[in-house]
Amino acid sequence: MSTFFLKQAQIEKQWIVVDATDAVVGRLAAFVSTILRGKTKPTYTPHMDCGDNVIVVNASKVKFSGSKMSDKVYYRHTGYPGGIKSTTPAKILRGKKPCEVVKLAVKRMLDDGPMARRRLKNLYVYAGPEHRHEAQKPSIVEFASLNRKNRR
């Protein structure tokens, strides 16, 4: 019997909604990245994008464990000499794009390369409780009730 490899036509993507209210960012990102990779499915194939589409709502209400909310530092570079910029999660969550904390955490949980960039396009993060994917009939996953450590 030969090893089963999934074909592109056999992939069935589902839509999953995860509520991030009071969720610990690292645990949420690990859970979402596992779904995006397709590791929760028995038909997982490493070289195919067989993961589901994930919608994260209430991303502005995430929590960090310990004192990471003020001590953790995100760096970026403008491209100019001496152009390194830094910010903290507290500043990002109070700013215009609070979803970036969750997106960046999930991005760093995925591998590097073209497949990870393709999988990251299946992630939709919203700061509030509303999303615009009701037509896809997403299933709701109670992330906070999976483990007592998932909430703060």
Curated annotation (Swiss-Prot):
This is Large ribosomal subunit protein uL13. The keyword tRNA-binding does not apply. Belongs to the universal ribosomal protein uL13 family. The lineage of its organism: Bacteria, Pseudomonadati, Pseudomonadota, Alphaproteobacteria, Rickettsiales. It holds the Pfam family Ribosomal_L13. Keywords: Ribonucleoprotein, Ribosomal protein. Part of the 50S ribosomal subunit. One of its GO terms (cellular component) is cytosolic large ribosomal subunit. One of its GO terms (molecular function) is mRNA binding. It comes from Neorickettsia sennetsu (strain ATCC VR-367 / Miyayama).
